[in-house]
């Protein structure tokens, strides 16, 4: 009789050690802010979002939640040796500026700040305007 081994619950993560430079992708939407840190080739080192850090509902869209998410992602990335980063901003949410400030405060050297917000050339129909 052959015994089947039970699959492990947690998948073992591959450790990326000693990466001196990388790219920080900040996607700031009206509902959330997502911070991903990659090496120059595009492999993810760490990521965090306002929802992952523990905020829910309308608090996810705040600038403070973006600050906490950026600090969390930067702390994990600095453990793998990250020192200098380029920042790519995408979106028009409240967490754009505060995420960049949090990265600088965490001790990362920001060399370039690039704005890659997608602008439609009259593509999809926008959502309806709010009437308050």
Curated annotation (Swiss-Prot):
Keyword line: Ribonucleoprotein, Ribosomal protein, RNA-binding, rRNA-binding
Q: What is this protein called?
A: Small ribosomal subunit protein uS11
Note the subunit structure: Part of the 30S ribosomal subunit. Interacts with proteins S7 and S18. Binds to IF-3.
Does Ribosomal protein appear among the keywords? yes
Q: Would the keyword rRNA-binding turn up in this protein's UniProt record?
A: yes
Q: Which GO terms describe its biological process?
A: translation
Which Gene Ontology cellular component terms are annotated?
A: ribonucleoprotein complex; ribosome
Task: Extract one GO molecular function annotation from the record.
Answer: rRNA binding
Annotated gene: rpsK
UniProt organism field:
Chlamydia abortus (strain DSM 27085 / S26/3) (Chlamydophila abortus)
- Where on the tree of life does the source sit, at the highest rank? Bacteria
Provide the family line. Answer: Belongs to the universal ribosomal protein uS11 family.
The job of this chain, per UniProt, is described as:
Located on the platform of the 30S subunit, it bridges several disparate RNA helices of the 16S rRNA. Forms part of the Shine-Dalgarno cleft in the 70S ribosome.
């Amino acid at each position: 009789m052959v015994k089947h081994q039970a699959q492990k619950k947690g998948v073992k993560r591959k450790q990326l050690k000693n990466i001196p430079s990388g790219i920080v992708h900040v996607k700031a939407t009206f509902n959330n802010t997502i911070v991903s840190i990659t090496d120059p080739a595009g492999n993810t080192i760490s990521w965090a979002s306002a929802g992952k850090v523990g905020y829910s509902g309308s608090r996810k869209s705040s600038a403070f939640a973006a600050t906490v998410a950026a600090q969390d992602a930067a702390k994990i990335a600095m453990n793998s040796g990250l020192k200098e980063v380029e920042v790519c901003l995408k979106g028009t949410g409240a967490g754009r500026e505060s995420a960049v400030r949090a990265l600088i405060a965490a001790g990362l050297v920001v060399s370039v700040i690039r704005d890659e917000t997608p602008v439609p050339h009259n593509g999809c129909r926008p959502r309806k305007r709010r009437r308050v």
